[in-house]
């Protein structure tokens, strides 16, 4: 196994083990949160500890509910099977609610997110209509993949070639290396990658989708955690906790809390 693969494997195990230890040390009942790495929402900091917007929000919200959050890295494509089987209690990681309302029990929305297309800074692509005959990389089972493959958005040419990637971080590298013409993902994730890697992509002005982010529980989960968490998140929004947490990672934090404007 090469150095890069070893580092990736170590990061996965660290995310799990650190989260498990902290949850056990708290003495509280554990809630297992399933996600994959997606800065700035969930990732390992320089000390190898899970951190990010969703980690901080989840930790505080579940603490108020009397639980300790334990974070498990998951194969994102298997998220529904994992939550339905009870291997994890919920899916939390910049997860769009739009179009999935009937698939899970939801808590939220707690944040607003824009799904966008990014291209090379010097690309001639200026709008979604310019994607005709171009190749766009998306994460498999993600919302952008659904939007592009469904053919339901009249702004998107039917001749776009869609490349579905399991690991979302590979998307960014493919665009940076010129292997694809564009990528589609959450705007905040793209901005974080640009910041971390000193790369200049250009984000198209018209978004694919403006959506609410939520926390997904299994449809057969009758514990009431979804409604309790929704109430707790509303309290955290009202007392300023959400804005303070988001503000540690993103500028203009208040704009991400305008959940009442979704669909307006």
Residue ranges and their predicted role:
Residues 1-17:
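N-terminal export signals
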Residues 19-21:
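Bacterial signal peptide processing site
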Residues 25-94, 102, 164, 228:
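Extracytoplasmic small-molecule ligand-binding "clamshell" domains
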Residues 36-37, 112-119, 195-234, 252-264:
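Periplasmic-binding protein-like
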Residues 44-46, 58-67, 144-166, 194-198:
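Ligand-binding cleft/hinge of the Venus flytrap
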Residues 55-64, 122-125, 129-143, 215-254:
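Extended ligand-binding regions for polar small-molecule ligands
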Residues 67, 75, 108-158, 220-222:
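A conserved helix-loop-strand patch within extracytoplasmic ligand-binding domains
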Residues 78-81, 94-103, 147-150, 174-210:
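A ligand-binding cleft/hinge motif common to bilobed small-molecule-binding domains
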């Amino acid at each position: 196994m090469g150095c890069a693969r070893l580092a990736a494997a170590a990061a996965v195990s660290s995310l799990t083990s650190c989260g498990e230890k902290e949850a056990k040390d708290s003495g509280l009942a554990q809630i297992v949160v399933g996600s994959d790495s997606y800065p700035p929402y969930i990732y390992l900091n320089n000390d190898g500890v899970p951190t990010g917007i969703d980690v901080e929000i989840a930790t505080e919200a579940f603490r108020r509910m009397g639980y300790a959050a334990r974070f498990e890295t998951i194969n994102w494509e298997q998220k529904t099977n994992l939550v339905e089987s009870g291997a994890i209690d919920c899916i939390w990681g910049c997860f769009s609610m739009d179009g999935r309302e009937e698939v899970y029990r939801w808590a939220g929305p707690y944040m607003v997110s824009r799904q966008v297309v990014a291209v090379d800074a010097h690309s001639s692509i200026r709008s979604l209509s310019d994607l005709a005959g171009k190749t766009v990389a998306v994460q498999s089972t993600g919302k952008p993949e659904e939007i592009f493959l469904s053919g339901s958005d009249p702004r998107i040419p039917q001749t776009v070639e869609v490349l579905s990637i399991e690991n979302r971080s590979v998307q960014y590298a493919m665009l940076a290396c010129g292997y694809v013409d564009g990528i589609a993902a959450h705007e905040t994730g793209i901005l974080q990658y640009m910041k971390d890697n000193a790369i200049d992509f250009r984000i198209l002005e018209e978004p694919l989708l403006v959506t609410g982010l939520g926390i997904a529980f299994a449809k057969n989960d009758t514990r009431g955690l979804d409604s309790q968490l929704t109430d707790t998140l509303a309290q955290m929004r009202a007392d300023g906790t959400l804005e303070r947490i988001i503000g540690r990672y993103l500028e203009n934090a208040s704009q991400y809390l305008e959940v009442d404007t979704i669909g307006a």
